[in-house]
Design a protein with these regions (language model features):
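Flexible, glycine-rich phosphate/dinucleotide-binding loops
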Residues: 26, 80, 121
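Glycine-centered small-residue hotspots that permit tight backbone geometry or close packing
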Residues: 21, 56-57, 123
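Short beta-strand/turn micro-motifs composed of small residues
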Residues: 21, 75-78, 116
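Conserved phosphate-binding/catalytic loop of the ribokinase/pfkB sugar-kinase fold
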Residues: 102-106, 111-124
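Positively charged, low-complexity intrinsically disordered leader regions
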Residues: 1-34
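Short, flexible, mixed-charge acidic loops at enzyme active sites
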Residues: 30-39, 116-118
Length: 124
């Protein structure tokens, strides 16, 4: 069975894939939470690091490309910095974004995750 899976994955080098769907920019923001806001009982995050990744259909396209397929991505984003960042990431991954449409009146979808480590606690 493992041999069959390896053979199938190797065969992706000969496959053309068209991905159509909603793309988004996934942003992870990491930091420390050393204090709580005086206005509300919420922690204040001191940002130490940020990472961005393709999300949604862009993630599917990037994964297919990593497996060796030739990938074209069709989607719509806004005309903003998140769109440019997402397109750059996809282009660098080898995904064809020539059918990507930019719409002036809409924002690019961005999903942000804020991950804080409390002071005095061990990381997991």
């Amino acid at each position: 069975m493992t041999h069959d899976l390896a053979t199938q994955l190797d065969s992706l080098h000969d496959v053309n894939v068209l991905v159509v769907g909603d793309v988004m920019l996934d942003r992870y923001v990491y930091g420390r939470t050393d204090r709580t806001s005086p206005e509300a009982p919420v922690p204040i995050l001191n940002v130490e690091q940020q990472e961005v990744f393709p999300g949604g259909a862009a993630a599917v396209a990037a994964f297919a490309r990593q497996l060796g397929a030739t990938v074209s991505l069709v989607s719509v984003t806004g005309n903003d910095s998140d769109s440019r960042t997402l397109r750059r990431i996809c282009d660098e991954a080898g995904v064809d974004t020539s059918a990507w449409h930019t719409e002036e009146r809409r924002p690019t979808t961005r999903k942000e995750r804020f991950i804080g480590q409390a002071s005095g606690r061990h990381g997991q």
